[in-house]
Amino acid sequence: METIEFDKPIEKALEDWGAEITEIHTLLGCCELLAGLAEEATELAQAALKMRRTLDRSNPTPMTTGDASRNLNEEFADVLLCAAVLGFDREEIARIIREKVFRWSTRLEEGCGDV
């Protein structure tokens, strides 16, 4: 199986706009940013469900898989941007990702017996 390699273009994009991100945080404040994050997370969930519909076709949609993929990427970017503006703890997120990947991989190896 091919290993997925992750680049750093997202971090670079956030670094390039660091001053603007700080300004957005100052202007909107934590409460409004949390509301925005919740809204964008909801839109991401809807985009993922729409993408699923384009792939399995059990409940057809006129949206193409390409359009659904672009929409999913846009909503994911919106969630990441909101999280970045809120100042999420990258080290903590990285630690959690490592734990969750290990747990997910282990469950799959064990045949999802302890989900």
Where would I find each of the regions flagged by the language model?
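Flexible "arm" and connector segments at domain edges
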Residues: E2-F76, L80-V115
